[in-house]
């Protein structure tokens, strides 16, 4: 009888431990929803308190913005006055890491000098990297965008991508080594032909962002835009970060593009993500030339 009781208590204990472990597992879908909710609160704060106040509230202390190169976002917005500038945006695509602490979203944006203006004077797309903070809040780690023509089609609905469960745990150091090796191969290939290099390492649904164009989604759609700006490209990385689950990463920095018309200098930003086989793929590519003086 005593042995039976001990076995029963041991079984209950192991069951409770199992349930606690399962409860502690990160939920990427729930995290993606929280991230998108933070994005919408970011926008709502801008509508209620002003764009400057919104950026200062939702940027991480080390968050990056591009003006045109990478700068500390809080320092940039802290120096700007609140002008009434009206910035409207809505996330239409979101992706989350397996560790549920690191994700990104993107979508259309439009702006005007203030709400008194009848028409919006500019249209574009934003891309934001979000990271979960120690206090459980979500903050913007990096924010950038492009300008494009005024859209004429129906507004997109939100699409959310989260990774599936792995059969075996991922070793962080091994994944980091694989990421660095993959990106090194990409940069070497780009020195010969940037378009071919991008398509070679791209995910099937890569998103390519260039000023003056709507985002190109998918290899076939991206090919003409990549070909139009192709050249012999060299990269100088200035910053990078990766999720704790080692399945989502970004890099940014400077580039030099040698083309027939001359050499173009600019800044780049890329998001890399592992596929089902654990191979690193380029899922988002943004590049912007430095404005001519």
Model-assigned labels for residue ranges:
Residues 1-10:
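Bacterial N-terminal signal peptides that target proteins for export
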Residues 9-18:
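Bacterial N-terminal signal peptides
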Residues 23-52, 56-58, 148-196, 200:
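Short, low-complexity N-terminal intrinsically disordered segments enriched in polar/charged residues
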Residues 29-33, 50-101, 120-121, 195-247, ...:
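A solvent-exposed, acidic/Ser-Thr-rich amphipathic alpha-helical stretch
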Residues 42-43, 89, 102-106, 127-130, ...:
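Short, structured motif recognition centered on aromatic/hydrophobic residues
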Residues 59, 69-70, 100, 107-111, ...:
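A mature extracytoplasmic/lumenal domain signature
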Residues 77-79, 91-96, 108-111, 125-132, ...:
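Hydrophobic/aromatic beta-strand elements that line small-molecule binding cavities or substrate pockets
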Residues 123-160, 265-291:
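Short beta-strand edge/turn micro-motifs at domain boundaries
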């Amino acid at each position: 009888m005593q042995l039976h009781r001990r076995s029963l208590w041991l079984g209950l204990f192991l069951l409770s431990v199992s349930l606690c472990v399962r409860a502690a597992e990160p939920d990427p879908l729930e995290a993606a929803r929280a991230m998108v909710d933070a994005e919408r609160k970011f926008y709502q704060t801008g509508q209620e308190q002003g764009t400057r106040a919104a950026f200062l509230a939702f940027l991480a202390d080390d968050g990056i913005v591009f003006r045109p190169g990478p700068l500390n976002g809080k320092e940039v917005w802290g120096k700007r006055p609140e002008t009434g500038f009206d910035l409207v945006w809505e996330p239409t695509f979101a992706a989350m890491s397996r560790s549920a602490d690191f994700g990104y979203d993107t979508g259309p944006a439009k702006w005007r000098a203030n709400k008194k203006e009848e028409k919006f004077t500019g249209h574009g797309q934003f891309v934001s990297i979000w990271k979960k903070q120690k206090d459980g809040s979500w903050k913007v780690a990096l924010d950038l965008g492009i300008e494009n023509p005024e859209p004429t089609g129906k507004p997109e609905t939100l699409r959310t991508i989260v990774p599936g469960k792995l059969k075996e745990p991922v070793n962080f150091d091994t994944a980091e080594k694989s990421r660095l090796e993959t990106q090194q191969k990409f940069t070497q290939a780009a020195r010969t032909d940037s378009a071919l290099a991008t398509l070679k390492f791209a995910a099937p649904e890569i998103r390519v962002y260039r000023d003056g164009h709507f985002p190109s989604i998918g290899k076939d759609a991206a090919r003409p835009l990549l070909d139009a700006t192709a050249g012999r490209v060299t990269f100088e990385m200035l910053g990078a970060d990766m999720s704790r689950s080692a399945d989502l990463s970004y890099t940014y920095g400077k580039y030099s593009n040698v083309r027939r018309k001359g050499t173009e200098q600019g800044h780049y930003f890329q998001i890399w993500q592992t596929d089902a086989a654990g191979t690193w793929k380029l899922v988002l590519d943004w590049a912007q030339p430095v404005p001519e003086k």
